[in-house]
């Protein structure tokens, strides 16, 4: 499936129906009064978050979404039919902005969460509304009001508890395929992963945790270099970052610092997110020339985060690393619950 994480669309709510001018014409009411009904309300445009969508691909092919107009008023004080609301389904994790002002309109993170994004126009008034002691036969009515019209920018931020980050070719796709049933494209060259891959990793309890393999970041990603700028936003919703570092690199410390600097430059508290570090590809390291334990100690001193020696290919060290992930997630969940009840 092609991954589309941004889209620009136009939405327009329905116009309110027009009020009408009408008079009672019953046989035994020779001086019938006004009976023109009001117009119906225009339909609204409502966004609904659903679980079975993972991309904004549908919005690439359809850019304009319009709800139905309200019906005209009728005689005998009948109000026109309301226009049908237009329901637009979006993936959970969709953030909606006004494309012209940049204002945040909504953030749909939960299944079935709804947001009225454009309200339908109010129906116009029929002439019966204008009946008064001074005017017993008003011959005018009001048209319905237009519905709201907006130009929107949609952004999809993945809903994953654990974000796997690192430079290109750190082994992120291999790791997520080893941990879960996900089968991302894997090859030995940079930027193999062009879209974020999701995998569900099972805890010993059987509960699933969503991991996201974030495409490789490079120096300058926060300023738009490489693939990073478009994908850094996906890290925003994660609770824990699993920072993967290639143990076969010529300079492991430099690689670590490169990613940390990009997280700090991007802001939004990403550099303060709880992290676990993993030196990957230890099966390919010459232990006689590389002291992995010393590198792990250096990284621990730099990051103040736990460091694990792993191989995603041979699955060496994955279980202890996962136990640390589960423990940190439990801490984060406990802190969030404490904040809710405090």
UniProtKB/Swiss-Prot annotation:
First and last residue of the signal peptide: none
Residues reported in the UniProt entry to bind Mg(2+): 173, 193
GO biological-process terms attached to the record: ribosome biogenesis
PROSITE patterns, A to Z: G_OBG, GTP1_OBG, OBG
EC number assigned by the record: 3.6.5.-
Cofactor names: Mg(2+)
GO molecular function: GTP binding; GTPase activity; magnesium ion binding
One Gene Ontology term, aspect cellular component: cytoplasm
Segments forming domain Obg: 1-159
Record's subcellular location: Cytoplasm
Domain OBG-type G: 160-330
Swiss-Prot/TrEMBL keywords: Cytoplasm, GTP-binding, Hydrolase, Magnesium, Metal-binding, Nucleotide-binding
Transmembrane segments: none
Binding site for GTP: 166-173, 191-195, 213-216, 280-283, 311-313
Family label: Belongs to the TRAFAC class OBG-HflX-like GTPase superfamily. OBG GTPase family.
Alphabetized NCBIfam families for the sequence: Obg_CgtA, PRK12297.1, PRK12299.1, small_GTP
Function (record text): An essential GTPase which binds GTP, GDP and possibly (p)ppGpp with moderate affinity, with high nucleotide exchange rates and a fairly low GTP hydrolysis rate. Plays a role in control of the cell cycle, stress response, ribosome biogenesis and in those bacteria that undergo differentiation, in morphogenesis control.
Subunit and interaction comment: Monomer.
Name the UniProt record assigns to this protein: GTPase Obg
Organism lineage string: Bacteria, Bacillati, Cyanobacteriota, Cyanophyceae, Nostocales
């Amino acid at each position: 499936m092609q991954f589309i994480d941004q889209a620009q669309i136009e939405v327009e709510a329905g116009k309110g129906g027009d009020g009408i001018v009408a008079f009672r014409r019953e046989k035994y009411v020779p001086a019938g009064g006004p009976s023109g009904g009001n117009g119906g309300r225009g339909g609204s445009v409502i966004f609904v978050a659903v679980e079975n969508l993972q991309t904004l691909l549908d919005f690439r092919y359809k850019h304009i979404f319009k709800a139905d107009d309200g019906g005209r008023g009728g005689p005998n004080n009948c109000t026109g039919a309301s226009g049908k609301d237009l329901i637009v389904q979006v993936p959970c994790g969709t953030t909606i902005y006004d494309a012209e002002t940049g204002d945040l309109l909504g953030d749909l993170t939960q299944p079935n969460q709804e947001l009225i994004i454009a309200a339908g126009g109010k129906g116009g008034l029929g002439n019966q509304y204008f009946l008064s002691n001074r005017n017993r036969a008003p011959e005018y009515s009001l048209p319905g009001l237009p519905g709201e019209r907006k130009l929107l920018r949609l952004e999809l931020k993945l809903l994953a508890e654990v974000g796997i980050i690192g430079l290109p070719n750190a082994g992120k796709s291999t790791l997520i395929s080893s941990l879960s049933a996900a089968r991302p494209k894997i090859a030995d060259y940079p930027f193999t992963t062009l879209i974020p891959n999701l995998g569900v990793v099972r805890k010993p309890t059987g509960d699933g945790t969503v991991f996201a393999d974030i495409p490789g970041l490079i120096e300058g990603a926060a300023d738009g270099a490489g693939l990073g700028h478009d994908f850094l936003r996906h890290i925003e919703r994660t609770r824990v970052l699993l920072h993967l570092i290639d143990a076969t690199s010529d300079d492991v410390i430099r690689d670590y610092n490169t990613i940390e600097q990009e997280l700090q430059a991007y802001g939004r508290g990403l550099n303060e997110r709880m992290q676990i570090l993993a030196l990957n590809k230890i099966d390919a390291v010459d232990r006689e020339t590389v002291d992995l334990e010393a590198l792990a100690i250096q990284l621990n001193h730099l990051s103040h985060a736990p460091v694990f020696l792993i191989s995603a290919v041979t699955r060496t060290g994955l279980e202890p690393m996962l136990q640390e992930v589960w423990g940190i997630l439990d801490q984060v969940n406990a802190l969030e619950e404490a904040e809710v009840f405090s």
